Structure formats: C-alpha cells, structure tokens
C-alpha cells in the first residue's frame, strides 16, 4: 500500500552562515539559521518521509537541544529516515519537493541536489523531483528574510 507524507520547513536567513539547499553548498551572501546545517529542503523531505511511515518528525529524532546535531549535515537525517522506511519493509516510491525563496536561482544546481537527496535516501535521482518558486515579493519570504520548503513522499509499505 502506498503511504504519503507531507513535510514543511522554514528557516531565517542570516549573515555568516553557509547556505545549504538539497545537500548542495550555494554561493550566497546569507545562509539559513538553524542548529544543524539548516538545509530547509532536506528537512522538509525528511519530515515527509517520516510522516508517510507514521514516525513523527525530524525534531523527534534530531532535537535542536542535542549538541551532537550542532551544524550536522542534513543528509544524516535523510539517511535515518530511509533506514526507518527499510526497517518497516517499505520502499520509497518518489519524493517531490519545492523550495520557496526569492534567491538564489537553483535551476543549474537541481541535478546535484537530486543526486544528493537520492544518495542520502538510497534511491535513484529519477525518483526525486526538486523545483523552486518565489513568494512574489510577499511576506518574510518575499523580503528575503528566510526560505521555506515543502515536500511530499510516496512510500510503498507492506499491508
């Protein structure tokens, strides 16, 4: 039976941090603020996968209060989510994720982002969709104060 999960994440943009999106380092004047690397796209994907298998959210496994996750790469979080899928006898069918940000443009980086997400989840890049949109200059996203991402995961689980 196919189970679906939805993930959403948002982080504030700050000076002095490296910007990571979909497991790829971006040249940008600001980075996302968070306890880990704050990769908003990978966090949304992680929550979608965990939600699809009824395993809570990223904070349940990697609480921001735990110092071991300080500046941790988000690929660790995705790998754990994939491990939980496998332990339950499931297989990830596909991931579809959208970044919401005014900048930077991600199109040239999408193949590398898909590869990074796929590697962390032990799936093919063909099973990963990544796209972006702006917030049409509206709200905190439009003012470039932060970035958001949403994701859907489809996972085939045994009956």
Name these PLM-found stretches:
Residues 130-134:
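Pyridoxal 5′-phosphate
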Residues 1-113, 120-121:
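RNase III-family endoribonuclease catalytic core
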Residues 5-7, 136-139:
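Glycine-rich, charged/polar anion/phosphate-binding loops
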């Amino acid at each position: 039976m196919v189970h679906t999960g939805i993930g959403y994440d948002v982080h504030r943009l700050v000076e002095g941090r490296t910007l990571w999106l979909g497991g790829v380092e971006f040249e940008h004047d600001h980075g996302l603020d968070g306890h880990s690397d704050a990769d908003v796209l990978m966090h949304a994907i992680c929550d979608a996968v965990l939600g699809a298998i009824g395993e809570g959210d990223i904070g349940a496994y990697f609480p921001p209060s735990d110092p071991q996750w300080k500046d941790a790469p988000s690929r660790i979080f995705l790998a754990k989510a994939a491990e939980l899928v496998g332990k339950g006898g499931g297989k990830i069918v596909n991931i579809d994720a959208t970044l919401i940000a005014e900048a930077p443009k991600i199109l040239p980086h999408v193949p590398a982002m898909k590869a990074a997400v796929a590697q962390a989840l032990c799936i093919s890049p063909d099973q990963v969709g990544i796209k972006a949109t702006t917030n049409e200059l509206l709200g905190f996203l439009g003012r470039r104060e932060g970035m958001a991402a949403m994701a859907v995961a489809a996972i085939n689980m045994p009956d």
